[in-house]
């Protein structure tokens, strides 16, 4: 049975391994998403320090990772489109599933955990974004109930200005 743990230093190597596998998969799909040094070990270390990253663990094995954030995302301030809600929201970022665990519902369980966290904290919605051509992620988002809202450009970091499709799920 899947359980969720707050990421800690004991998992950093596995987190980096899963991330590098995801980067290779995206590169193999011909996408530039996550190809400029993000997310990095330093990003995960800050997430661990901030307590905002969760691990999906089944039978002692880390199968997935996601960051859950409760502060406004600067990338979501301007959208070519319309958000489903106004005001406060939570967001999920850096969602990745370990090789060998894809297609087993891990992403769906991580999204469900994010929705539960958001509800517990009183947020009416969860937002997320992905590359316009990352069709596997877009399918996973649709399956989880996210609705496309428009296009955004990332703000800050090594992917500054990159185009993404923005999604929102009303809880």
Protein language model regions, located:
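Conserved GNAT acetyl-CoA-binding A-motif
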Residues: 111, 118-130
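Conserved acyl-donor/pantetheine-binding loop and adjacent beta-alpha core of acyl/acetyltransferases
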Residues: 67-96, 102, 155-158
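Conserved beta-hairpin
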Residues: 50-68
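Conserved GNAT-fold acetyl-CoA-binding loop/helix
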Residues: 23-43
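Conserved catalytic-core motifs of GNAT/GCN5-like acyltransferases
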Residues: 129, 142-163
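Conserved acetyl-CoA-binding loop-helix of GNAT-fold acetyltransferases
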Residues: 97, 103-116, 139-143
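A short beta-loop-alpha structural element at the N-terminal edge
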Residues: 3-17
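Conserved active-site alpha-helix within GNAT-family acetyltransferase domains
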Residues: 108, 120, 133-150
């Amino acid at each position: 049975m899947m359980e969720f743990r707050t990421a800690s230093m004991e998992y950093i190597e596995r987190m980096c391994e899963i991330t590098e596998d995801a980067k290779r998969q995206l590169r193999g799909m011909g996408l530039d998403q996550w190809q400029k040094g993000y997310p990095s070990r330093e990003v995960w270390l800050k997430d661990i320090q901030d307590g905002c990253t969760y691990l999906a663990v089944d039978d002692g094995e880390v199968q997935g990772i996601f960051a859950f954030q409760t502060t406004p995302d600067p990338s979501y301030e301007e959208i070519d489109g319309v958000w489903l809600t106004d005001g406060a929201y939570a967001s999920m970022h850096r969602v990745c599933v370990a090789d060998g665990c894809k297609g087993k519902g891990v992403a769906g369980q991580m999204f469900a955990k994010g929705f539960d966290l958001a509800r517990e904290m009183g947020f009416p919605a969860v937002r997320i974004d992905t590359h316009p051509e990352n069709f596997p992620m877009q399918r996973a988002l649709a399956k989880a109930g996210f609705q496309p809202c428009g296009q955004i450009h990332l703000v800050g970091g090594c992917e500054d200005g990159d185009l993404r499709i923005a999604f929102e799920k009303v809880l």
